[in-house]
């Protein structure tokens, strides 16, 4: 039995262009847990997940309604919103296949440094895409907007995660044979002021936060699931090459060369490198459908010491 942190990508709940309703996200979550059932049943597993579209939707609904909410509150709400979908999907898979583990959704806070340079340079996209005609209206909400290939998106600070405050609870649930859902959306960002903890407006990268969690609970493996089977170098070029088993020094060299896209593959590779350098055995980057093959070493990108 191995201890594994599995970081679900956005495609575990939504595909590009799909309607962001409960039914669509539940259907994807159900298929995700069906694919992962052997991994979750036979190992000690923590599930983490992103919240990019969802937290943007939550924040936008508050801004439009005039009720108002801090971004860190919206992150916490997204943990409950997505956690319910994941918990319902897993519970129904548990019934179908007579699995034994109970699932728990944990509102997870993650400590960051209030002096992190990310607070003066927001780059993390959240929410939907906006057209050129819509962007000025969006800016009236006080949002910082950035142009991407498919349109404009709101960007927010994304500070580096330092510590998972609910780590003892996660450890307890694992030790007692449960399946925790934690660090949703990278965790609720908080800062320490003296002896007090307070929320701060940001969205933490869920892969980097998952790496911090995996190190803290002494996980054997970090598995980052996305919409491709492998990490590629020279992506989209004639000499594109998929990476299979790669030593941490080699993939770190590719990272420094700028081989991996900002906001997409780059943070996943960074998370894998940090995990291995902090004592992890292996990190996997692959698709949900390929997870079993990756664990057995047959496919996917596997980062080792």
Curated annotation (Swiss-Prot):
It is an enzyme of class 2 (transferase). Keywords: Arginine metabolism, ATP-binding, Cytoplasm, Kinase, Nucleotide-binding, Transferase. One of its GO terms (biological process) is arginine deiminase pathway. Pathway: Metabolic intermediate metabolism; carbamoyl phosphate degradation; CO(2) and NH(3) from carbamoyl phosphate: step 1/1. Pfam families: AA_kinase. Disulfide bonds: none annotated. Its EC number is 2.7.2.2. Belongs to the carbamate kinase family. This is Carbamate kinase.
